[in-house]
């Protein structure tokens, strides 16, 4: 991992990469991403993360196998996707970068087979601890995002959106999921597929990450990737709702104006202080720069140039710091 030191130490204070106008130092290209591997350990007894004023943190459930995403059903039950990346197809070539990433992920506790299931957690007495933990839906394919629309529960697998019938209070679903729409798969550099339904349930929105850092495998590998896709759940038809978002993960609807917001993981290998991850309101049809530019129209020199695309790039709303891997996003309505 000595190659990771080629970028040198960070030159900016941590808060310089946050806010509506983050500092953007000159890029310093490196061979592999900036990494600092934290050991995967639990919280000791009596300890917990420190929350912002007015909020608290406590353990809701434990003993889960690689939990990655949560979804709260209207009756208060919580679904958790126990999941990991799918096995890559044998046709996918894997080089030094992939080898390093596998080692990094394994050390961080992520080098395990995917459990491929959704587990239900229920806190019936409302004491902040789930007393029921039970398998809810199994036999999936690296599931991640979940969304309820009407009487159907939609799940974003690594390669498709699927659906099952749902009735309030169910603790297990045994029917075979119905395929609603295919999703970009293949190499699956970013395999997680986040999912939200429109407030009226008539459309689904899927966050699909890029298949690379900055398009190094060719743009043929990036069709309908680095984008939010809009899907008609009745027909399975899909279109690109917004693009140029390297890895759009957490999504939520603003209760104030109804706009869709997203948290985005940006690119690597141009220094510790670049590029800031961000959250932003999503402009329908908007293009957010990837891979040709970042934070609006700051040109990334690594991909083949495309000035016309750079000129279209929308500047995001709020930076969240470089390499923070910002994932979840939720509006508080309390």
Model-inferred region functions:
Residues 59-64, 134-141, 180-187, 240-245, ...:
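Surface loop/turn motifs at the tips and blade-to-blade linkers of beta-strand repeat domains
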Residues 3-5:
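C-terminal motif of bacterial Sec signal peptides marking the signal peptidase cleavage site
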Residues 73-76, 148-151, 197-201, 254-257, ...:
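Residue-level detector of Asp-centered blade-edge/turn motifs that repeat once per structural unit
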Residues 121-126, 164-172, 282-289:
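Short loop/turn segments immediately following beta-strands, especially the blade-tip
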Residues 79-81, 155-156, 205-207, 261-264:
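Residue position within the beta-strands of beta-propeller blades
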Residues 66-69, 145, 194, 250, ...:
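Conserved beta-strand position repeated once per blade in WD40 beta-propeller domains
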Residues 129-152, 157-199, 210-213:
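Asp-box/WD-like beta-propeller blade repeats and closely related beta-sheet repeat scaffolds
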Residues 7-51, 87-109, 113-115, 192, ...:
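Beta-propeller domain segments
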């Amino acid at each position: 991992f000595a190659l990771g030191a080629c970028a040198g130490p960070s030159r900016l204070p941590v808060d310089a990469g946050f806010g509506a106008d983050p500092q953007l130092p000159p890029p310093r290209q490196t061979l592999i991403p900036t990494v600092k591997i934290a050991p995967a350990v639990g919280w000791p007894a009596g300890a917990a993360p420190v929350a912002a004023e007015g909020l608290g943190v406590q353990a809701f459930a434990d003993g889960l196998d690689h939990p990655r995403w949560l979804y709260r059903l209207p009756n208060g039950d919580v679904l958790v996707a126990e999941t990991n990346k799918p096995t890559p197809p044998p046709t996918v070539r894997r080089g030094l970068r992939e080898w390093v990433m596998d080692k990094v992920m394994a050390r961080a506790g992520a080098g395990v087979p995917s459990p491929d299931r959704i587990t239900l957690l229920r806190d019936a007495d409302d004491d902040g601890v789930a007393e029921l933990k039970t398998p809810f839906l199994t036999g999936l394919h690296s599931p991640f995002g979940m969304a309820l629309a009407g009487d159907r529960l939609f799940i974003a697998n690594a390669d498709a959106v699927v659906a099952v019938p749902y009735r309030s209070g169910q603790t297990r679903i045994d029917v075979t999921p119905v395929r609603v729409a295919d999703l970009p798969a293949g190499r699956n550099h970013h395999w997680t597929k986040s999912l939200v339904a429109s407030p009226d349930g008539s459309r689904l929105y899927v966050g699909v990450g890029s298949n690379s850092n900055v398009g190094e495998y060719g743009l043929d590998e990036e069709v309908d990737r680095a984008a939010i896709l809009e899907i008609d759940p009745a027909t399975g038809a899909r279109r690109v709702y917004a693009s140029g978002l390297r890895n759009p993960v957490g999504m939520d609807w603003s209760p104030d104006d109804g706009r869709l917001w997203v948290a985005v993981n940006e690119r690597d290998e141009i220094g510790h202080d670049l590029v800031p991850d961000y959250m932003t309101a999503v402009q329908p049809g908007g293009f957010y720069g990837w891979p040709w530019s970042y934070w609006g129209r700051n040109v990334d020199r690594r991909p083949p140039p495309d000035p016309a695309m750079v000129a279209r790039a929308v500047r995001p709303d709020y930076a969240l710091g470089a390499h923070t891997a910002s994932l979840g996003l939720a509006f508080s309505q309390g």
